[in-house]
Amino acid sequence: PPPLPILPLPNAFQLQWQKSNMALFFHFGTNTFTDSEWGTGHADPTIFNPTKLNTSQWIHVAKEYGFSRVLLTAKHHDGFCLWPSEYTDYSVRSSNWRNGNGDVVADLAAAAKDAGVGLGVYLSPWDRHEECYGDTLRYNQHYLAQMTELLTR
């Protein structure tokens, strides 16, 4: 007889994810405008002003080149959030882009859904902007609040 499977076994969704084609990772934020790999968390949020942002174009290119899903860095180590987070002053809400009413995450999610492309988000556990970083209990509460906010909108 064949050997017994070793647990845990992937569920149908996990198996589909494992069998899917390539994923494309979008890293976009204030660093795009400062030409730096990692930000310090102190860049003026008004520097974020992607006046020609077209997330549908991103998805079109991803799909054209065979990517079945995309991942967006919703918040990198600098702490700048690409959605208007209620838990920080360091987000698109504090930028001039769309008068502080922009939301890269929502725009990309809509474009991906319309094109039938899967979407994932990366939320850095390190946050160089938030003063509570380093205070484990306070920061964990902050991080979980942002994660919940991001995943339930």
Residue ranges: model-predicted function:
Residues P1-R153:
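Mature catalytic domains of secreted/periplasmic carbohydrate-active enzymes
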